[in-house]
Amino acid sequence: MTRVLLLGGTAEGRALAKELHPHVEIVSSLAGRVPNPALPIGPVRIGGFGGVEGLRGWLREERIDAVVDATHPFAVTITAHAAQVCGELGLPYLVLARPPWDPGTAIIAVSDIEAADVVAEQGYSRVFLTTGRSGIAAFANSDAWFLIRVVTAPDGTALPRRHKLVLSRGPYGYHDEFALLREQRIDALVTKNSGGKMTRAKLDAAAALGISVVMIARPLLPAGVAAVDSVHRAAMWVAGLPSR
């Protein structure tokens, strides 16, 4: 039976594991950064691999035949490592990346730092920040007030002087997002172009309220990497792998 490492932690990763089970031997791997994560069907490992060398050794030891990368679109480190190691070992490697959002009239930034510069340049005063823990520090010196929504508390991270922290996990509905933006008198939304339906509602609510959007563009995938944008296409790719 084909043995596949599924780099997950996303709804797409869980859906793919469910679709492939029990026809393919799937080992899902989660980064372990979120407490009590939703677990996929089948065997799961949690935690990092120890860089390129650690991942290479693990793939060899576990006799993995192929790797499907269904991590978050901004999980650039593990994607770069997986692409490199699979290339070196000659293992089939596929990225399952949910379709990005259409930015529409959003101001496009290429990094958290650039997004913080846009907030300052545009003079936004009440900002809804949904870039995740890793992006908060870029806004630490901003004069604006921030509503910061994250899954877990950003321990040890520099925070903006004026802010409100909300610990919450999606999915979020349109009406709830609309009410939140209006009640908090938000004049700008800063978000990453994560794509997908689970957190799309904030963009629709912002558009309905005429709220400005600053969207951080997705990082490019490593050169030459094969990618699909649906669970079905990823399952078809796995089904086409040669059997042992």
From Swiss-Prot:
Enzyme Commission (EC) number: 1.3.1.54
Pfam family name, one: CbiJ
Signal peptide stretch: none
Pathway info: Cofactor biosynthesis; adenosylcobalamin biosynthesis; cob(II)yrinate a,c-diamide from precorrin-2 (aerobic route): step 6/10
Keyword NADP: yes
InterPro entries: Precorrin-6x_reduct (IPR003723)
Top enzyme category: oxidoreductase
One GO MF term: precorrin-6A reductase activity
Keywords (A to Z) from UniProt: Cobalamin biosynthesis, NADP, Oxidoreductase
PROSITE patterns: COBK_CBIJ
A biological-process GO annotation: cobalamin biosynthetic process
Catalysed reactions listed for this entry: precorrin-6B + NADP(+) = precorrin-6A + NADPH + 2 H(+)
Role: Catalyzes the reduction of the macrocycle of precorrin-6X into precorrin-6Y.
Similarity-based family: Belongs to the precorrin-6x reductase family.
PANTHER family the UniProt entry points to: COBALT-PRECORRIN-6A REDUCTASE
NCBIfam families found in the cross-reference section: precor6x_red, PRK08057.1-2
Protein name: Precorrin-6A reductase
Organism field: Mycobacterium tuberculosis (strain CDC 1551 / Oshkosh)
Higher taxonomy: Bacteria, Bacillati, Actinomycetota, Actinomycetes, Mycobacteriales
